[in-house]
């Protein structure tokens, strides 16, 4: 059973994402849990976890759309090898921004809307489609085994807003010995780009204070990335595993 947990106070977005996941998982037992009055993403996800019954938990933003059609099969395969998977993260977390350490530690594949109706496929980091040894993941989309979430919970006291809950959850998982991976064959469109503001900085400071002694040493560095602009009708073909691997090889 897959338990899909989404926090959203936007009815139109909530309706879309429910329909999207119901379609993706139509051939698999699943439940969709909407938290429409979350006080924070930590609090909302904790409530969703308490309501859930599945052995695989998915925590998703409300503004994503998968290009990959066989998401359930890929998740089942990845979670047979790892405990927590996502679409962006780092093998070296040096502060409250997962991209801070730069190349060769950061890995991602995410698609953003661009001008003229095109979309930009953004690939970060060379290597295989599925990268093990991850220390922290972005929270745009996360999937994990139930025992991970139950054993860790969510820190709604320190992260009582909508930022850094994801790094807190996934870095905590890493510190507890769970196996994390970035799986870039889970290609999705993310309708929004995060913009750090004063609230984000507040929670970044809280995160660094909480984990100061566990963060890796290092100075910020640039990431290596590849950007490809495509019309929507070409996305599925481009995001097939062999095609993606070929594109990512250009970063090597």
What is each stretch, according to the model?
Residues 57:
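Short aromatic/hydrophobic "clamp" motif used to bind/position activated sugar donors
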Residues 120-144:
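A recurrent flexible, glycine/aromatic-enriched loop bordering the glycosyltransferase active site
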Residues 38, 65, 69-110:
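Conserved donor NDP-sugar-binding/catalytic core segment of glycosyltransferases
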Residues 136, 146, 150-171, 180-189:
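Donor nucleotide-sugar recognition loop
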Residues 199-209, 223-252:
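Non-catalytic, C-terminal membrane-associated alpha-helical segments of glycosyltransferases
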Residues 10-26:
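Short, well-formed alpha-helical segments that are part of the catalytic scaffolds
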Residues 38-52:
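Glycine-rich, basic loop-to-helix element that forms the pyrophosphate-binding segment
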Residues 181-201, 206:
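Active-site donor/metal-binding and catalytic loop motifs
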């Amino acid at each position: 059973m897959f338990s899909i947990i989404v926090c959203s106070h936007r009815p139109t977005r909530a309706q879309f994402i429910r329909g999207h996941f119901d379609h993706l998982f139509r051939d698999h037992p699943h439940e969709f849990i909407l938290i429409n009055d979350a006080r924070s993403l930590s609090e909302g996800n904790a409530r969703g976890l308490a309501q859930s019954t599945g052995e695989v938990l998915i925590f998703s933003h409300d503004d994503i759309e998968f290009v990959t059609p066989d998401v359930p099969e890929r998740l089942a395969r990845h979670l047979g090898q790892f405990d927590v998977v996502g679409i962006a993260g780092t093998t070296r977390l040096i502060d409250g921004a997962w991209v801070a350490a730069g190349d060769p530690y950061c890995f991602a594949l995410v698609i953003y809307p661009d001008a003229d109706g095109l979309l930009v496929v953004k690939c970060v980091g060379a290597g295989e489609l599925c990268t093990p040894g991850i220390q922290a993941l972005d929270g745009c989309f996360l999937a994990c085994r139930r025992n991970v979430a139950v054993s860790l919970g969510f820190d709604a006291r320190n992260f009582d807003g909508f930022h850094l809950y994801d790094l807190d959850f996934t870095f905590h998982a890493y510190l507890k010995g769970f196996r994390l991976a970035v799986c870039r064959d889970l290609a999705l469109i993310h309708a929004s780009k995060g913009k750090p503001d004063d609230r984000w900085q507040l929670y970044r400071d809280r995160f660094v204070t909480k984990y100061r002694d566990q963060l890796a040493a290092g100075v910020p560095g640039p990431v290596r990335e590849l950007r490809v602009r495509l019309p929507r009708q070409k996305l599925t073909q481009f995001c097939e595993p062999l095609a993606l691997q070929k594109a990512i090889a250009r970063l090597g």
